[in-house]
Amino acid sequence: TIKTLEKLGYNDLVGIHNDTVVVDTSVGEINNKHRYVTDKYGIPCTYLYQEQFEWVEYKPRKPFLVLDKVYPEGVFIPKTLIGKNIVHLPTVKTHVFTTITGAMKNAFGGLLHRNRHWTHSVIHETLVDLLTIQQEIHPGIFAVMDGTFAGDGPGPRAMRWHEKNILLASADQVAIDAVSAKLQGFDPL
């Protein structure tokens, strides 16, 4: 993916990481081999939870379904992501709150700050709101979903891994997640 993007003229690639209440991002990027890849290809990484990154209040063009109720003080997103193309790199796996996790759930980790777990009771509506935000702030959205190993069980952390050797790719976040769900045995409709 990196070499192809660079051949096509995308030379300002950046790895984006956000904080989580459960996993140390610096440990995760090493254990998941992300750091190896970014180092090998000279891709700089941005850590959105570091103080130098500004989070700005986002005002949607149309009313939110739920985010304004979960965050009555305002919905804040990373300023650095506004106006940037985005390539999500999710994995094929199940999720204890959302059934599966994929491209749309990947935005959950990037666009919402540390208290994003507050949205779990309304997660499906939250994902719709996040897709709306993405479509408004990113000129291009693409996902390459890694199914070389797919996980099932009470994910995303307590997984049973299965070798499946598939890759999915799409500019349609709903479609790629629907295909992933179907491949995992769930009815996406």
PLM ranges: what are they?
Residues 1-189:
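N-terminal and secondary-structure boundary signal
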